[in-house]
Amino acid sequence: MVSNKLEQTFKFANDKNIERAERVLMQALVQDAVGVDLILTKLEPKDFFGFPFNFIFQTAQENYSEGNKLFGSALLEAVKFKLDTDSKTQREIEGLFEDVLLKGLPFLERDIKVFVDVVKKASIFRQLKQFAKKVEKEEFKVKDDRFEGYLQAIQNDFTKIIHSAFVSIPGLSYDEIVREEEELIPKVYRGELTVKGLKSGFYPLDQLTSGWKEGELIVVAARPGRGKTALLINFLQGAVNDSEKFDKNKDVLLFFSLEMRNREIYQRHLMLESQVNYTLTSRQRLANVYDDLIKASEVLRDLPIKIFDYSTITLDEIRAQITEVSKTNNVKLVVIDYLQLVNAFKNSYNISRQQEVTMISKSLKSFAKEFNVPIIAAAQLSRRIEERKDSRPILSDLRESGSIEQDADMVLFIHRVKDEDSENQEAIGHNNIFQVELILEKNRSGPTGKVQFDFQSDVSTFRVREYNPDGYS
């Protein structure tokens, strides 16, 4: 029989989910059920509330790390051996195995991950409570000359707790990777898969980038007033039109607008869809295009795009929003307009803005990998580049903005042809069409190059003129 001492293990919490979770995981471990590898790699002995579960788990994990997966009677004997000569405790462990772990509660394979998460979360909360008690207890005991060292020590302790909450991603063997690549290579050979990621809506650009790929950070940089927001909206349109990779019934695009209200973003998208700038159109002419506007509005109504407009937003808030939407939808693309308006923290700290922007770009890259989604972030360039003889943007123009240049997988610059050019000046005066170059200055996984566009600013529309792959003059 199981002793009263061991029964306390099952009654340690009011939350019956935690109690059941620990039991189920122990059962899976002892019975070598499907999912044991996840249990042994994600959890630690301290994640279980107390003896004997933590002791059983430690024994199993030590043998697992040495290449021996023990279960059933073999695991029981290993546990008893570690207990040495404590015969009373050995008998209690035997009773636990016989009465609970080798019989006990039924469970399904899909339950394992859920119960692992329950146990891990409960463990983190226990550790945080213990950490808080420790800090409170030491409040008046730390001497002034040791305060900085004390702060460093508690920061390290806190960081260890937080880091233990994250699951390590299992590595893939070459065999597993090759299986995926073997399916792709014939398609590439036949020309069926020139674009691996989500389409931008511009064929020449997709030929350079292979599309917006999962886990990548793409930065679109330009001086103020060069059409960054308009281009991002064009990218949204291109993504939702990608019928091969975007399912309007399941997928969603997220747009974080820090400069414009959500209504302004919608208006620009409506102008793009309808090709009508209704805010500047006379009432008489508007009557002629009214049906086009209504039709375009109906198209946009059904698009799975969520716009978050903030005057300021922190990294934690961006992550929280992506997490929340991911619970019910498949997030295919995240767009941020623009990067330098994001705050790393809710409160200001004693760090430079350059350091903060570095934290932001590194975190956005981390989010892209964590959520397995491409993130496109606009970035603003200083007007000082106009002082150069050749005002075409280059990568070093981003260096004053932290480590954007290093963190981004792709960097695209919007460069408007010199306004003093007579042809372009005439266009500016007549129909708001500007000649611009979209320069792919950095591409970690492919060629660089440029695509020439006509940018019709009054209806937020980019149209391809021509493109030049593999470099430019």
From Swiss-Prot:
This is Replicative DNA helicase DnaB. Belongs to the helicase family. DnaB subfamily. The lineage of its organism: Bacteria, Bacillati, Mycoplasmatota, Mycoplasmoidales, Mycoplasmoidaceae. It is an enzyme of class 5 (isomerase). It comes from the Bacteria. The main replicative DNA helicase, it participates in initiation and elongation during chromosome replication. Travels ahead of the DNA replisome, separating dsDNA into templates for DNA synthesis. A processive ATP-dependent 5'-3' DNA helicase it has DNA-dependent ATPase activity. GO terms for biological process: DNA replication, synthesis of primer. ATP binds at A222, R223, P224, G225, R226, G227, K228, T229. Keywords: ATP-binding, DNA replication, DNA-binding, Helicase, Hydrolase, Isomerase, Nucleotide-binding, Primosome.
